[in-house]
Structure formats: C-alpha cells, structure tokens
From Swiss-Prot:
Residues 101-106 are annotated as: Connecting peptide. Crystallins are the dominant structural components of the vertebrate eye lens. It comes from Mus musculus. This is Beta-crystallin A1. Has a two-domain beta-structure, folded into four very similar Greek key motifs. Residues 1-13 are annotated as: N-terminal arm.
Length: 198
C-alpha cells in the first residue's frame, strides 16, 4: 500500500523582488526581511520591483532615510510607479523594510491640531482623499496617535506629495511632532490619508 504524505510549507507573509534596471530587467534578488543598504547586496540601486506579499516601505537613501514610498502588493516597473503623483523625482530606492502592523480592517488613527496631542482631534478609521473636504479645519496636522494598523499620510489632497508612513508599532504609535514622521519631513502639512493594504 502506498501512502502519499503532503508537507505544507507555511506561506511567507512578506516578500519583495528587486531589480537593478527598469521593467524588471537586470540583476534581481528576493527578500523576506529588511534591507538597510542595497549596495551591500551588490546593487547600485533599485530601479524596479515586485511586491509579492505584504506591504513595504522603500527609502530614497540607505539606513531607512530620506523620502518614503509605500509599496503594496503589485508591480513597480519604474520610479514613477512607486512615487505615483508625487512631484518629487526620485528614480531609485536604496533601502526598504516590511510593514508588519498593517491591518486594513481594524486601522484607527487620531489626528491632533497641535504638537504633543493638543487641540482639536479627530479619530479616523477610513481613507480620506481630502481631510478638509471631510471636515478637518486646516491643511496641517500637529501630531498623531496610531491606535491600530499602519497609515500613509500625504502632503496634498488626492494622495499626492510627500508620503509619510506611520505605524502603531513605531514610536509606540505616538507621533508627537511632525519631524517624527520621517527623516524627509519638512512640514506638518497633511491633506489626505489612507490605510495601508496588507
């Protein structure tokens, strides 16, 4: 009698494939964890990529510094695919890491008028292409508390401009001042916000 035994390999929840040329050409490498410097993996930079599983943050510079770009499941054949309608021309990524706290269904964030969680506040559990159109009184946010999940905040309405990725498991979910949003943060201007897809 012959018995067939199947061994199920756990499905990896995060995976990204990077390429050193546009349109998925050239050298390629797969990752299932953070990469603080693609140069240490014999890449000059990342020019295209595919996110197979999970959500990731790509950075303009090494050591997770510089402009941030949200990388959700899908293909990014060129720089303009990850920068979207961003007016800032960044043709490469030098480091990236997975977002472990993305939980689209249960995401919750509270935005505050001023730094240190002072002033008017608004609890958000949904995507808003324009905070002002939905009732927020100005184009700036002083501080934010991430109760659950991960969010991407944009400088302008319609998910445009600088991207700031905020997670409940970084800074304890507390972002007291706009410089904590990322090393590239230059202003407290936030006009659209959305949950990160896992």
């Amino acid at each position: 009698m012959l018995y067939l035994v199947l061994f199920l390999v756990p499905f990896n929840s995060i995976q990204i494939t990077i390429y050193d040329q546009e349109n998925f050409q050239g050298k390629r490498m797969e990752f299932t964890s953070s990469c603080p410097n693609v140069s240490e993996r014999n890449f000059d930079n990342v020019r295209s990529l595919k996110v197979e599983c999970g959500a990731w943050i790509g950075y303009e510079h090494t050591s997770f510094c510089g402009q941030q770009f949200i990388l959700e499941r899908g293909e990014y054949p060129r720089w303009d695919a990850w920068s979207g309608s961003n007016a800032y021309h960044i043709e490469r990524l030098m480091s990236f890491r997975p977002i472990c706290s993305a939980n689209h269904k249960e995401s919750k964030i509270t935005i505050f008028e001023k730094e240190n969680f002072i002033g008017r506040q608004w609890e958000i559990c949904d995507d808003y292409p324009s905070l002002q159109a939905m009732g927020w009184f100005n184009n700036e946010v002083g501080s934010m508390k991430i109760q659950c999940g991960a969010w991407v905040c944009y400088q302008y309405p319609g998910y445009r401009g600088y991207q700031y990725i905020l997670e409940c498991d970084h800074h304890g979910g507390d972002y007291k001042h706009w410089p904590e949003w990322g090393s590239h943060a230059q202003t407290s201007q936030i006009q659209s916000i959305r949950r990160i897809q896992q």
